[in-house]
């Protein structure tokens, strides 16, 4: 706690001119609080749809492991399907749709461990470590001086969608596909790759979703580095 995980994600969302929602996960949160529900209107004598905060482009799922599994599942199902069913009606989620979640260490009181099947739906995991002593001094200085950054959008949603199309065109050679498959297979069968010593460190090997996401991330990294093709270093 206290490492500015939430602040970093909120800042990223503010840089993009899109809709942003923050969902604070708590033990008493219900699935309807995330995806929405039907509300009876006495005026019209009918049920009306009230959409939840999941209907945004950028979603911050703050402290996701503080909510019960059924609430986590509601969000992660929306991530997988890119649609939500409220009552008998299915609604498509907006595009782009990006979910970023923070979690506290599982040894802390009041946390629920995320099942592996749910963790698998996230593309990347970033470990936030403590700042260096110089960085911490700068944090102290800027906080005491009341310095606040003036953050304005610099990217439109349409630009992100166009960039995504370009990333999908980045060339991925068959040798790179083999390289990615070997990496993932080595997490499942380390002994086949002469890595018997790491087997006790692996609880579950990477799923096919890991291979797909690794290829997508490699393409995006190549794009950021102004290349139209993927090299092993991108992986």
Positions of predicted regions on the chain:
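Residue-level signature of catalytic and energy-coupling elements of molecular machines
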Residues: 1, 34, 75, 122, ...
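Hydrophobic aliphatic residues
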Residues: 12, 16, 29, 38, ...
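Canonical AAA+ ATPase core
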Residues: 41-46, 63-71, 79-170, 219-222
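Conserved Walker
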Residues: 7, 70, 74
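Basic, amphipathic alpha-helical bundle interface domains used for macromolecular binding and assembly
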Residues: 144-235
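Walker A/P-loop
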Residues: 1-26
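Short beta-strand-centered segment that lines the nucleotide-binding/catalytic pocket of NTP-utilizing
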Residues: 19-31, 88-95
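Conserved alpha-helical scaffold flanking the Walker A/P-loop in AAA+ ATPase domains
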Residues: 40-60
């Amino acid at each position: 706690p206290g490492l500015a995980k939430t602040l970093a994600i909120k800042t990223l969302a503010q840089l993009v001119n899109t809709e942003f929602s923050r969902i604070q996960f708590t033990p008493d949160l219900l699935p309807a609080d995330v995806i929405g529900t039907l509300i009876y209107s006495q005026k019209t004598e009918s049920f009306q749809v009230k959409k939840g905060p999941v209907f945004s482009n950028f979603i911050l799922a703050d402290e996701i492991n503080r909510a019960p599994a059924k609430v986590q599942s509601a969000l992660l199902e929306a991530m997988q399907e890119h649609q939500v069913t409220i009552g008998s009606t299915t609604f498509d989620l907006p595009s782009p749709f990006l979910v970023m979640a923070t979690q506290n260490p599982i040894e802390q009181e009041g946390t629920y461990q995320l099942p592996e099947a749910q963790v698998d739906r996230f593309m990347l995991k970033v470990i936030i470590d403590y700042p260096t002593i110089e960085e911490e001094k700068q944090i102290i200085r800027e906080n005491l001086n009341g310095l606040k950054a003036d953050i304005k959008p610099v990217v439109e949603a349409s630009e992100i969608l166009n960039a995504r199309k370009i990333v999908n065109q980045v060339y991925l050679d068959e040798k790179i596909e083999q390289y990615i498959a070997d990496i993932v297979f080595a997490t499942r069968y380390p002994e086949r790759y002469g890595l018997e010593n790491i087997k006790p460190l692996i609880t579950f090997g990477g799923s096919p979703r890991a291979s797909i996401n690794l290829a997508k991330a490699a393409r995006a990294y190549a794009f950021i580095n102004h290349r139209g093709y993927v090299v092993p270093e991108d992986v």
